[in-house]
UniProtKB/Swiss-Prot annotation:
This is Cytochrome c biogenesis protein Ccs1. It is a multi-pass membrane protein. Belongs to the Ccs1/CcsB family. The gene is ccs1. Keywords: Chloroplast, Cytochrome c-type biogenesis, Membrane, Plastid, Thylakoid, Transmembrane, Transmembrane helix. It is found in: Plastid, Chloroplast thylakoid membrane. The chain crosses the membrane at residues 23-43, 82-102, 168-188. One of its GO terms (cellular component) is chloroplast thylakoid membrane. May interact with CcsA. It comes from the Eukaryota. It comes from Porphyra purpurea (Red seaweed). One of its GO terms (biological process) is cytochrome complex assembly.
Length: 437
């Protein structure tokens, strides 16, 4: 009974080894991973449950399986961090590793072995094998050297090869993919993403975390200050670019780094990347009759083709003005309680309105920032570079040529792993040049 169990365990191990080293199995895994990645792209990730209930209702127009209950049940709202997706990545990496150890490395070791032929009958298996007239092994070797072959001679037999990098490259392709997956998983489980809407002149810390991994670390040993926020406009009043002037401070308020960021030009600090993503207007500062400065909050109103910011200026209980801003270009419009336009004002100027002197001091903008940490990025970039390089190198043909001399007759033949027609033409050139020398 024990013997049978041992045989069964051995059979299982061999079955798993063959399965994981099978190219078709790896391709199927890759297609499954790609399919779930597409699902993760189609379905919005890391949203609140209310969002999925509103957009993927059970009785909605979506396919009956694609409803919020199934999305929540199978983790399709956070596909890339689910246990089953990470398991698929692990199995795929294991398959590549087993394939490299059981197939690619032994194949490379076989390619490095010198193999000399002794019998002309061995050349019958080669396509394009030939017989060279009137030459010597020395002359043939000299011709092969001009075609960049590595040559080894044993008696009346020559073995040569070139393009060994083409056999080595698939191992690096597999290793690069494994490193790429490791870097991606590292970013998923230990990275985080935060969003902050910060008024100009204010400090902020990392608080509004919108996504994080199981092992994420949120640093709290620094703060950041938005020194200024400005928007550049085109001649047609459309936005050209918006900028945030940011200082990174330590716990004592000492500036550690200072940078002005804009879209596609983030700030880098200790593994964190701060992106410029959005902007808003939160208030306007005014003075009425030289009293203390008042900060009037503004509410954003989204219109079909535009957006405006609206605030109320209360001069007294019965006299209120509505202030409307369209942008940061220091122009505003005042309306009375009836909705009638009173006048346009310029920020930075004083106006006499309803027996009051109102000074419109400044607009208080806020900048939308996204802060990301992804420890796997260096690994991903490095592995992707090696992946592209090794894939390119893998297209180098690995060619082998054998030559023997038997009774003053010279036989030449060879094999290659790709570009068979080109190799046969090269073999013909070697034969012709060797016989003409």
């Amino acid at each position: 009974m024990q013997i049978n169990l041992k045989f069964k365990k051995k059979d299982v191990r061999w079955y798993l080894l063959r399965l994981f080293s099978n190219l078709q199995f790896s391709i199927i895994l890759l297609l499954v991973i790609a399919s779930f990645s597409v699902i993760g792209t189609i379905i919005e990730q890391n949203k609140d449950l209310d969002f999925y209930q509103a957009h993927y209702s059970v009785s909605g127009e979506h396919f009956i399986i694609l409803n919020w209950k199934n999305i929540e049940l199978f983790g399709l709202n956070h596909v890339y961090t689910t246990w089953w997706f990470l398991t698929l990545l692990f199995i795929f990496s294991l398959s590549l590793l087993v394939c490299s150890l059981s197939r690619q490395i032994p194949s490379l070791q076989n390619a490095r072995r010198w193999c000399f032929y002794k019998n002309p009958n061995q050349f019958k298996k080669f396509t394009g094998s030939q017989e060279i007239q009137k030459t010597t092994l020395h002359l043939v070797a000299s011709c092969l050297q001009k075609f960049n072959y590595h040559i080894f001679q044993q008696g009346n037999s020559i073995y040569c090869y070139k393009g060994l990098l083409g056999r080595l490259a698939p191992i690096f392709v597999h290793a690069s993919i494994i490193l790429l997956l490791i870097g991606s998983v590292l970013g998923l489980v230990s990275g985080f993403s935060a969003q902050e809407m910060v008024p100009s002149g204010e400090l902020f810390r990392l608080q509004n975390i919108i996504a994080s991994g199981q092992f994420s670390y949120i640093p709290q040993d620094f703060s950041a200050r938005v020194n200024n926020f400005i928007i550049e406009y085109n001649q047609d009043n459309s936005i050209s670019q918006f900028f945030s002037d940011i200082s990174i401070l330590d716990t004592e308020g000492t500036e550690l780094k200072h940078s002005t960021i804009h879209v596609n030009s983030p700030l880098q600090f200790k593994g964190l990347t701060i992106y410029q993503t959005d902007w808003d207007i939160i208030a306007i500062r005014i003075k009425i009759n030289n009293t203390d400065t008042l900060q009037i909050p503004l509410k954003k109103v989204v219109l079909p083709n535009n957006k405006i910011w609206v605030g109320l200026i209360a001069q007294d209980q019965d006299n209120q003005l509505a202030l409307v801003l369209q942008d940061l270009q220091k122009q505003a419009t005042l309306y009375n309680k009836s909705g009638e336009k009173i006048m346009s004002v310029t920020i930075g100027e004083k106006y006499f309105i309803d027996n009051n002197i109102i000074a419109f001091l400044s607009i208080v903008p806020s900048t939308g920032l996204q802060i990301k940490s992804d420890p796997g990025i260096p690994i991903v970039y490095t592995s992707f570079f090696f992946l592209i390089t090794s894939v390119s190198v893998s297209y180098i043909s690995y060619s082998q040529i054998w030559i023997i001399e038997k009774k003053h007759r010279f036989y030449i033949g060879g094999v290659t792993n790709r570009a068979q027609l080109t190799f046969e033409e090269e073999l013909l050139k070697i034969s012709n040049r060797s016989s003409k020398i």
